[in-house]
């Protein structure tokens, strides 16, 4: 058996250190998205839209979650497009879990580090910069303060996962147009690649391109639910038509998947989430097959890998069941209920080391990013006084220069 790294130490899937019921209101959140104008009158039986400023959420964690984050000096950034939430999850000086939330409508792909975070939203791509110097804190507890410095309007592209190229440019999965894109100074996006089976760029979400794996600072692999080249063609092909595509060669390197998501290259392997089955695993390139490693009880979406440890996002079904997916049968076989939350797992032993669980109005997560070297982060929102009053600057003016 391989030796465990410090990140893999102290598996503690039992017990709860923190259980918080929170009802968000105007005073609790930083920004509130304006309601969209409906295209048509809603059905009398339709579920009312969720008010993003007034949701009730209960969070619980494994007993060792806070200490694990603290001892490894790492934090998590999570998104939930359903509730428009970004959660920064860190630890305080006592090793207790710290949750810091902000509202960004339809928060989707997120990727970041100690200095910078990118976030995909409903119609903008956000860039946040940390304004704190080393060993500096704000509000006496936060060692990183991510401030929105740029929001590029791209339109509603159903933006999914993001990556950072070695030249510093952000690349994103443009799901609506079935392509990979970069930002354009003039237009909504610049298409840089599309799957070989997609005949044209059209706003039709043909194959549900969704996940992106970066390798050596370049986009290398993507996941798609199927190879459809017709409008919305993926919805009837969720069971076993999923593929992984090599962006450089256009080769299908894995097939027969069920709603694959979140490919990640780590330590010589391509890991991904076969969401329709509930399994985390890796790709056998010789057989072009998925090798399942461990089952997680939920629809898997959002994966971040740090050393031999992964953070896996889990979501509940939208209509009580994962209809047409093997995941339903797997849950029934294990007498398990689906989760909404995060499981920290060892890629060596496939054990769950720690976990976070959400209950209440939040039932779906989208993306996860480890923030190495960050202990307790915060993020400035759009509707608090901080967005107006928190001003920092750099200067090229020599001190003491006379007027």
Residue ranges and their predicted role:
Residues 347-403:
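Blade-level signature of beta-propeller repeat domains, shared across WD40, Kelch, NHL, RCC1
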Residues 59-71, 103-116, 152-169, 198-220, ...:
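Beta-rich, blade/repeat-based domains predominating
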Residues 61-73, 126-137, 222-239, 313-337, ...:
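Short, conserved, GDST-rich strand-edge loop motifs in beta-rich repeat architectures
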């Amino acid at each position: 058996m391989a030796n465990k790294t410090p990140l893999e130490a102290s598996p503690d899937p039992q017990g709860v250190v923190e259980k918080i019921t929170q009802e968000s209101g105007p005073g609790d959140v930083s920004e509130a998205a304006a309601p969209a104008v409906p295209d048509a009158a809603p059905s009398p039986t339709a579920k009312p839209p969720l008010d993003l400023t007034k949701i009730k959420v209960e969070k619980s964690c494994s007993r060792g979650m806070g200490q694990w984050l603290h001892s490894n000096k790492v934090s998590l950034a999570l998104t939930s497009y359903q509730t428009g939430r970004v959660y920064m999850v860190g630890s305080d000086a006592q090793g207790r879990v710290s949750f810091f939330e902000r509202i960004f409508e339809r928060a989707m792909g997120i990727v970041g580090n100690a200095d910078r975070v990118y976030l995909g939203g409903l119609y903008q791509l956000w860039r946040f910069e940390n304004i704190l110097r080393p060993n500096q804190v704000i509000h006496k507890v936060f060692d990183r303060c991510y401030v929105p410095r740029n929001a590029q309007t791209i339109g509603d592209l159903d933006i999914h996962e993001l990556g950072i190229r070695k030249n510093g440019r952000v690349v994103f999965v443009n799901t609506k147009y079935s392509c990979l894109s970069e930002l354009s100074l003039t237009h909504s996006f610049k298409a840089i690649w599309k799957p070989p089976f997609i005949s044209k760029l059209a706003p039709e979400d043909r194959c549900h391109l969704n996940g992106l794996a970066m390798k050596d600072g370049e986009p290398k692999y993507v996941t798609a639910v199927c190879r459809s080249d017709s409008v919305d063609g993926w919805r009837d092909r969720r069971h076993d038509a999923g593929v992984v595509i090599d962006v450089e060669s256009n080769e299908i390197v894995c097939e027969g998947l069920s709603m694959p998501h979140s490919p990640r290259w780590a330590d010589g392997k391509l890991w991904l989430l076969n969401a329709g089955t509930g399994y985390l695993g890796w790709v056998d390139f010789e057989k072009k097959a998925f090798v399942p490693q461990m089952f997680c009880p939920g629809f898997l979406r959002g994966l971040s890998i740090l050393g031999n440890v992964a953070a896996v996002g889990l979501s509940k079904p939208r209509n009580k069941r994962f209809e047409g997916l093997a995941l339903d049968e797997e849950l029934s076989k294990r007498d398990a209920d689906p989760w909404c939350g995060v499981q920290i797992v060892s890629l060596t032993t496939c054990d769950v080391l720690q976990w976070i669980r959400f209950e209440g109005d939040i039932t779906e997560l989208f993306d996860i990013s480890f923030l190495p070297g960050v202990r307790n982060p915060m993020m400035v929102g759009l509707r608090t006084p901080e967005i107006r009053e928190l001003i920092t600057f750099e200067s090229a003016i020599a001190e003491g220069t006379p007027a």
